[in-house]
């Protein structure tokens, strides 16, 4: 009898041990998971204002952060302006004083990143040879556990649309709903601490300062290389160009180009008489005097910039960004509207009949292969913008409506990459950057609002949608961070306007006085 009793006790102890392990595993799983975080789609990295998610449709942005945004009260804004990087809200690793001592905010090569990251990494730098190629293999999928990302396979969803999800799941929890310990140093340093914003204003930030989730998403797109980017460096990198030097280089190279119906396959499809007779670049041959580019960032709310915006000769807006109900902050005038291809392709946006897209100059775009192969693009666009374009042109033949040529879009990408010391995402620039360059080609002076965020910076993606995500400001699919750093170098406006209004002032290309020949003029 005793042996049986002993065996029974052993089995009971073993069962208790197994149940204990199971309970521990379940406890660890639920404590490490983040059920409040939205599941990301395969793109959805819409920039904060350029490729707008449209009204009534929510998206998930990969690399989304679940941190609270900066306080938007006047007192908080004043504190931000009065603060000094040597006494930041949450200091970055390394000595902040080095930023002020080094020219252009940089020390030298590897040391700059080493001091910020705490370890040496060469992955962000160009190789020594004159060209490099992005990897084009299938990347490893990340999982949405313990703060990581789960990225669907490239064929599952488009680069600009994610699954529609209940709105409440897309919103950040408010500060009052989270325990105090949730606001730890990881959250504050994630994307837009006071120190980070200060350095963004100075142009002294890098991707190594982004939170790990955005960095992971950026690495994903680096390895995926959907558009087949094969960048060849033609001359030395010019990340240290001065603002005037960079402006002259851009003036020499940037030529706004749209489909004119002369190239195959469009020439064989009868597009020549369909497109506007006057090219976009010649609509205002004498140039507009003063123009505004109004980003759709949530930070523009409570800005009272509407009257100033409407005072410009021309105003550019993006996608479905409305003015009705927001006139005090964004104004009412719209001259040009840049729209992504989803607006044309998705019937829910009522592109043909909506008043939002009437009585304005329309400029549409869709990502094409880096090779700018028009035949391949026509057969497989991200969204079929060609059919609705034809329908719109036939119904409203007098309205100026253009489709940007892929070569123009990728030319802008080349300029960003050549003037950036890091490898940037091999994806098209944001609509915001495209719009800025178009207006610099058409206007004598361009005022850009809330592209580089002001003290009102918030993770609210767009002023007309209750949707929060840090990736809207710093990007992950688009090379937004690098675009902003480049525009910061071009800014001729005041620091006060940048801080309080989020306003950057850029000269139009036609007003520049550049040397006839330049020693750096090595690009074709």
Curated annotation (Swiss-Prot):
Please give the catalytic activity noted in the UniProt record. a beta-D-galactoside + CMP-N-acetyl-beta-neuraminate = an N-acetyl-alpha-neuraminyl-(2->6)-beta-D-galactosyl derivative + CMP + H(+)
GO BP terms, alphabetized: N-acetylneuraminate metabolic process; oligosaccharide metabolic process; protein glycosylation
Tell me the protein family, please. Belongs to the glycosyltransferase 29 family.
Q: Which residues lie on this side of the membrane: Cytoplasmic?
A: 1-11
Q: Which keywords accompany this UniProt record?
A: Disulfide bond, Glycoprotein, Glycosyltransferase, Golgi apparatus, Membrane, Signal-anchor, Transferase, Transmembrane, Transmembrane helix
Keyword Oxidoreductase among record annotations: no
Region ranges (Disordered): 152-174
Q: Enzyme class, one word?
A: transferase
Give the Pfam families listed for this entry.
Glyco_transf_29
Membrane topology category: Single-pass type II membrane protein
Q: Might you report a single GO cellular component term?
A: Golgi cisterna membrane
**What EC number(s) has UniProt assigned to this enzyme?**
2.4.3.1
Where mainly located?
Answer: Golgi
According to UniProt, the name of this protein is Beta-galactoside alpha-2,6-sialyltransferase 2
* Summary of the tissues where the protein is detected: Mainly expressed in brain and embryo. Very low expression is also detected in spleen, oviduct, lung and skeletal muscle.
Q: Which InterPro entries match?
A: Glyco_hydro/deAcase_b/a-brl, Glyco_trans_29, GT29-like_sf
Q: Name one GO molecular function term.
A: sialyltransferase activity
Q: Which gene encodes it?
A: St6gal2
Q: What does this protein do?
A: Transfers sialic acid from the donor of substrate CMP-sialic acid to galactose containing acceptor substrates. Has alpha-2,6-sialyltransferase activity toward oligosaccharides that have the Gal-beta-1,4-GlcNAc sequence at the non-reducing end of their carbohydrate groups, but it has weak or no activities toward glycoproteins and glycolipids.
């Amino acid at each position: 009898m005793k042996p049986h009793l002993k065996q029974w006790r052993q089995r009971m102890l073993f069962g208790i041990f197994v149940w204990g392990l199971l309970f521990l595993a379940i406890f660890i799983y639920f404590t490490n998971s983040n059920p409040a975080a939205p599941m990301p789609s395969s793109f959805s990295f819409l920039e904060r204002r350029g490729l707008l998610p449209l009204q009534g449709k929510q998206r998930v942005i990969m690399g989304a952060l679940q941190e609270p945004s900066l306080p938007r009260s006047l007192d908080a804004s004043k504190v931000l302006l009065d603060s000094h990087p040597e006494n930041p809200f949450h200091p970055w690793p390394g000595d902040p004083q080095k930023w002020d001592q080094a020219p252009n905010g940089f020390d030298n090569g590897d040391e700059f990143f080493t001091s910020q990251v705490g370890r040496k990494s060469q992955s962000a730098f160009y190789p020594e040879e004159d060209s490099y190629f992005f990897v084009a293999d299938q990347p490893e999928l990340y999982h949405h556990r313990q703060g990581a990302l789960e990225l669907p396979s490239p064929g599952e969803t488009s680069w600009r649309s994610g699954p529609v999800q209940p709105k409440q799941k897309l919103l950040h929890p408010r500060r009052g709903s989270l325990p105090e310990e949730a606001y730890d140093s990881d959250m504050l340093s994630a994307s837009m601490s006071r120190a980070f914003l200060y350095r963004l204003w100075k142009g002294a930030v890098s991707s190594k300062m982004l939170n790990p989730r955005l960095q992971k998403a950026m690495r994903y797109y680096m390895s995926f290389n959907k558009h087949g980017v094969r960048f060849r460096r033609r001359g030395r990198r010019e990340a240290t160009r001065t603002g005037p030097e960079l402006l002259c280089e851009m003036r020499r190279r940037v030529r706004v180009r749209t489909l004119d119906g002369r190239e195959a396959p469009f020439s064989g499809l009868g597009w020549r008489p369909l497109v506007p007779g006057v090219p976009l670049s010649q609509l205002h041959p004498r140039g507009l005097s003063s123009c505004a580019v109004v980003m759709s960032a949530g930070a523009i709310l409570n800005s009272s910039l509407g009257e100033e915006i409407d005072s410009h000769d021309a105003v550019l807006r993006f996608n479905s960004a409305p003015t009705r109900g927001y006139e005090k902050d964004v104004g009412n005038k719209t001259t040009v509207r840049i729209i992504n291809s989803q607006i044309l392709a998705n019937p829910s946006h009522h592109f043909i009949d909506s008043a939002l897209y009437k009585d304005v100059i329309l400029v549409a775009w869709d990502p094409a292969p880096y090779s700018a192969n028009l035949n391949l693009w026509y057969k497989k666009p991200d969204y079929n913008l060609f059919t609705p374009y034809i329908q719109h042109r036939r119904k409203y033949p007098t309205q100026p409506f253009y489709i940007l040529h892929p070569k123009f879009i990728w030319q802008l990408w080349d300029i960003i990459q050549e003037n950036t010391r890091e490898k940037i995402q091999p994806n098209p620039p944001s609509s915001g950057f495209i719009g800025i360059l178009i207006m610099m080609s058409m206007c004598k002076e361009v005022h850009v609002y809330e592209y580089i965020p002001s003290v009102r910076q918030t993770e609210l993606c767009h002023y007309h949608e209750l949707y929060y995500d840090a990736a809207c400001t710093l990007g992950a699919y688009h090379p937004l961070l690098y675009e902003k750093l480049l525009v910061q170098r071009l800014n001729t406006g005041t620091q006060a306007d940048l801080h309080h209004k989020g306003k950057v002032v850029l000269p139009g290309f036609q007003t520049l006085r550049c040397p006839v020949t330049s020693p750096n003029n090595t690009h074709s």
